[in-house]
Amino acid sequence: MSSSERVAKVVLVDIEGTTTSISFVHDVLFPYAKQNVEKFLRDSWEEDDIKRIVQDLQQVPQYADYKALLSGPPTEVDVDLIAGFVRYLIDQDLKVTPMKTLQGLIWAQGYANGELKGHVYEDVPAAFEAWRAAGLQIAVYSSGSVAAQKLIFGHSLAGNLQPYLSAYFDTHVGHKQEQQSYKNIAKQLKEDPKQILFLTDIPGEAAAARCAGLQAIILKRPGNAALADDQKTGFELIPDFKPLHNLKVPVNKSQA
């Protein structure tokens, strides 16, 4: 099915490599979190939500791995230990939920004080406007926390894009290469999976979504990872959102 023939009720967008450049995430957001995590923790160490995040970080399997790398066993859980662990997780690009939550809080400060602006590709705002005008819902599914997602779109280079978005999902619904995650999203949206179009740059995510009954298209944005020949088969590949500007909701045959 070509882009011009597709119909859907919901467009589910990935962020990194889909609406937003991978370089923004890896070259701007991740370094900002690494540079500011220690100060952020020192300033907020006694706050209840930070205490919960610190407790959750100590429960993830990678925490034991990190402690094993240290010159000696830590005598206490303090800012230096947790900040070092968070920097380790960022360097390893590990999708650990409490770390993502903490990153979101750090980025919130950066957006609030004007040090950060969310990157979106130039075709994204026009596509969002066209889809909403056609009656479609737009939802987001990213490994970044919901709070971080809202910051990128709420403080984007194109202004506040949150009014276009009706739902946000992160790893609390499951990991992005697991079929069940997309079934969970469809259930929460109260929508037939086949009426949801998922846009991503990762073939494994597209395959998981399709196995759950969703439609899926792969984005080939500049800077995205090159696709092997076997990854290109079976999926429509598009360079940006422009081929989908005419996306429509399905016609109710009883009204046609």
UniProtKB/Swiss-Prot annotation:
Mg(2+) binds at D14, E16, D201. One of its GO terms (cellular component) is nucleus. Pathway: Amino-acid biosynthesis; L-methionine biosynthesis via salvage pathway; L-methionine from S-methyl-5-thio-alpha-D-ribose 1-phosphate: step 3/6; Amino-acid biosynthesis; L-methionine biosynthesis via salvage pathway; L-methionine from S-methyl-5-thio-alpha-D-ribose 1-phosphate: step 4/6. GO terms for biological process: L-methionine salvage from methylthioadenosine. It is found in: Cytoplasm; Nucleus. Keywords: Amino-acid biosynthesis, Cytoplasm, Hydrolase, Magnesium, Metal-binding, Methionine biosynthesis, Nucleus. It is an enzyme of class 3 (hydrolase). It comes from the Eukaryota. InterPro entries: Enolase-ppase_E1 (IPR023943), ENOPH1_eukaryotes (IPR027511), HAD-like_sf (IPR036412), HAD-SF_hydro_IA (IPR006439), HAD_sf (IPR023214). Gene3D superfamilies: 1.10.720.60, HAD superfamily/HAD-like. It catalyses: 5-methylsulfanyl-2,3-dioxopentyl phosphate + H2O = 1,2-dihydroxy-5-(methylsulfanyl)pent-1-en-3-one + phosphate. Substrate binds at S142, S143, K176. Its EC number is 3.1.3.77. Its cofactor is Mg(2+). GO terms for molecular function: acireductone synthase activity; magnesium ion binding. Pfam families: Hydrolase (PF00702). Coiled coil: none annotated. Binds 1 Mg(2+) ion per subunit. Bifunctional enzyme that catalyzes the enolization of 2,3-diketo-5-methylthiopentyl-1-phosphate (DK-MTP-1-P) into the intermediate 2-hydroxy-3-keto-5-methylthiopentenyl-1-phosphate (HK-MTPenyl-1-P), which is then dephosphorylated to form the acireductone 1,2-dihydroxy-3-keto-5-methylthiopentene (DHK-MTPene). Monomer. Belongs to the HAD-like hydrolase superfamily. MasA/MtnC family. This is Enolase-phosphatase E1. It comes from Drosophila melanogaster (Fruit fly). The gene is Enoph.
